[in-house]
Regions:
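Conserved, mostly hydrophobic/aromatic
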Residues: 166, 272, 307, 332, ...
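Terminal amphipathic helices with adjacent charged low-complexity linkers/tails
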Residues: 62, 190-238, 252, 261-264, ...
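Acidic, low-complexity intrinsically disordered tails
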Residues: 376, 594-656
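N-terminal [4Fe-4S]-dependent radical SAM core
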Residues: 1-20, 30, 225-300
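N-terminal pre-triad scaffold of radical SAM enzymes
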Residues: 26-31, 288-315, 348
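Conserved SAM/AdoMet-binding glycine-rich loop
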Residues: 25, 41, 56, 60-61, ...
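Glycine-rich beta-alpha loop elements in corrinoid/cobalamin-binding modules
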Residues: 11, 38, 57-250, 257-258, ...
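Flexible glycine/acidic-rich beta-alpha junction loops that bind and position SAM and/or redox cofactors
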Residues: 85-94, 142-144, 174-179, 204-207, ...
Length: 656
């Protein structure tokens, strides 16, 4: 049953009979006691272990005074920027400041600083020099090594160096936080540091058994060295076979990354999600309109963690890992019954999912024994012959969930992997999905159709997507359903040329699809695609990769994906003429744009869009794609939207 909120004021600390908290948890977002928010899970896990935790959410950061609010904690501070990297949260891919922040009271922007982890740590050091500080969450996790920073356009050192924190906890860290807090409680014995899984620390010498990465100085000076470092980091993020890694940060200090924490077992996950969350935003935000991010997940259920899809632009490998773990059927049904008991529940469970909704188990039996394969992906370029493909457990779960009294509909709004679904010869899951669990639109992510671009993205071939579309439409026709597909599309990904963008535009023309918004590739820390963006090399084969960086070319690529919009016609014509594709300029059935902008075309475009939507539902099953903050920061189920789909990163289970 729901409990009470953790204390947020000194008065609430005193009411609990505490002389001081053990830890003060500084977080760069509003306090929402819901298991979709990392600070809520970490706080409840520590509370269940007997620790006294006070929440310091969105502290005023221009001085150290706010960090003295609870006095000096007995053991130390915990710091996280929130479920999304603060720079991703604050800026668009064009480096323009966002106007809203759905993780803040009333959606108000500007309440957290840029590079929140570092700023908070600096203020803590000012307030209490020498006190232990543990940092975690997406921002810390994805910036644990020296990394390319898109906003500074340079290679930055590990955030552990910049923040001067005691330890950096990476990944989904329920067990890691308990191990580290116990280590702090016992006086921080240095000889025990190498035993702490999921932890990074600074050392004067590299451990004898560590793999030595190219140093910060080397990767700053040599992009080939950057690629070698990234590939080692990428390949060793495995809890079973991963090694200790070490990277020299400066003349005197080495960053040491211990092997990743083991994925939580099903029983451990069940215990975490059974903790007494209120599932509400703290009432101190009510007068400001609450916290918008909660509305997206208020009646959603997190079912799985991890993803073996391995898209190049996604940071899941670096944060949650490739080994999927999931909650038990009974745990999920228990949560569904709890949601159905709430007075404001309207009968609709908005999502049952995770990073990928139709993954429920590790890709194969070998993963838990030997780890995920170092040089082979489970689904790309083709599904591995050892991969277990089954939706039986998921179908059983969904049938029982929709039979719960008070539940009218159970939606699946997390993305599904259509290549995994296509590997399942049975139509059972797809049939049930279409009949009972689609809210008029199903999200899928083909991203592109050019073979060259898909290869760099690590996405399945165009033919796989087209076969899925046919299968999806056939099921909908069979049951008389009029349901859309929402394909997410990306422009300007490394490897994508203007020619590739034209190929995608022709595909959209031929399928009568009109994406209203598309996502420009966003280079964020911790992804293979960002490595390609910075170096111009694919670290997997060290081959050169074309990288569109010129803002005008990127605008042309984006315009080609929305070629029907009259506002884009000049850019589209320019791109087509550059490529010698004047055959696509004109009034014929194959033309993308007219020779000149026609009067009143904007009004006609609006009417055609509405008609095309209706037509596409019958002819191709497609609906307009929506924009998104980068998939690289979707670190569990799709995070609450802020101007569209939000990936990476950010979520929401432990390890924050």
């Amino acid at each position: 049953m729901p409990g009470s909120f953790l204390p947020v004021t000194p008065e609430e600390v005193a009411q609990r009979g505490w002389d001081a908290p053990d830890f003060v948890y500084a977080v760069g977002e509003a306090y929402v006691d819901h298991p979709s928010f990392g600070h809520a899970i970490i706080g409840r896990v520590l509370e269940a272990a007997g620790y006294r935790v006070a929440m310091l959410c969105l502290p005023e950061y221009h001085s150290a005074e706010a960090f003295k609010r609870f006095g000096r904690p007995k053991l130390g501070f915990l710091v996280s920027s929130g479920v999304i990297d603060s720079m991703v949260n604050h800026y668009t891919v064009a480096r323009k400041r966002r106007n809203t922040d759905v993780y803040a009271p009333g959606g108000r922007a500007g309440l957290r600083p840029d590079r929140a982890v570092t700023v908070y740590c600096n203020r803590i050091h000012e307030a209490y020099p020498g006190i232990p500080v543990l940092i975690g969450g997406v921002e810390a996790s994805l910036r644990r090594f020296s990394h390319y920073d898109y906003w500074d356009n340079k290679v930055r050192r590990s955030v552990l160096v910049d923040s001067a924190a005691t330890l950096l906890l990476y990944g989904m860290g329920e067990n890691t936080i308990l191990d580290c807090c116990d280590w702090v409680r016992r006086g921080m014995p240095a000889h025990e540091l190498p035993r702490l899984r999921g932890v990074c620390y600074m050392a004067k010498q590299p451990p004898r058994d560590a793999l030595l990465l190219p140093s910060h100085a080397e990767i700053t000076a040599d992009k080939h060295a950057y690629c070698r470092a990234f590939l080692l980091e990428y390949q060793e993020q495995d809890p079973v076979r991963g090694h200790t890694l070490c990277q020299q940060q400066d003349a005197q200090r080495y960053l040491v990354q211990n092997p990743p924490a083991l994925p939580l077992t099903r029983q451990e996950l069940d215990r975490v999600y059974d903790l007494p969350f209120t599932r509400l935003a703290h009432p101190m935000y009510d007068a400001q309109g609450g916290v918008p991010a909660l509305q997206e997940v208020r009646f959603s259920i997190s079912a799985v963690r991890g993803c073996f899809g391995a898209c190049s632009f996604c940071a899941l490998t670096f944060h949650q890992g490739r080994i999927v773990s999931s909650r038990s059927e009974e745990s999920l049904l228990k949560e569904a019954r709890l949601l159905a008991s709430f007075p404001d529940f309207k009968g609709y469970i908005h999502d049952v999912g995770g990073p990928t909704a139709n993954f429920r188990q590790p890709a194969c039996d070998r993963q838990l024994r030997e780890g995920a394969c170092k040089n082979r992906q489970c689904l790309y370029p083709t599904p591995c012959k050892h991969m277990r493909v089954s939706h039986t457990e998921l179908v059983s779960l969904l049938r029982k969930m929709r039979a719960i009294p008070g539940v009218k509909k159970v939606f699946i709004r997390s993305g599904i992997r259509y290549d995994y679904l296509m590997a399942d010869k049975s139509d059972q899951f797809l049939t049930e999905l279409c009949r009972y669990h689609v809210s008029g639109q199903l999200k899928v992510a083909p991203e592109h159709i050019s073979p060259n671009v898909l290869a760099r993205m690590g996405k399945p071939r165009r033919e796989v997507y087209e076969a899925f579309v046919e299968r999806y439409n056939a099921v909908n026709r069979k049951y008389g359903l009029n349901q859309y597909l929402v394909p997410y599309l990306m422009s300007s990904h490394p490897g994508c040329t203007l020619k590739d963008a034209v190929e995608l535009a022709e595909y959209l023309r031929d399928t009568s699809h009109q994406p209203e918004q598309v996502q420009d590739f966003y280079p964020t820390p911790g992804t293979l695609s960002t490595c390609m963006y910075y170096t111009g090399l694919d670290p997997r084969d060290m081959q050169p990769v074309y990288v569109p960086k010129n803002p005008h070319e990127k605008a042309m690529q984006r315009a080609l994906l929305q070629y029907r919009n009259p506002a884009n016609h000049d850019l589209v014509r320019e791109a087509l003429r550059l490529l010698g594709r004047e055959d696509l300029i004109g009034f014929g059935p194959h033309a993308l744009v007219p020779p000149r902008t026609i009067r009143s075309s904007a009004e006609r475009y609006s009417r055609e869009k509405a008609a095309s939507r209706a037509k596409s539902a019958h002819t191709y099953g497609s609906a307009p794609a929506r924009s998104r903050v980068p998939a690289s920061h979707r670190t569990d189920r799709a995070a609450p939207r802020q101007g569209g789909r939000r990936a990476g990163a950010g979520r929401k289970g432990g390890g924050r």
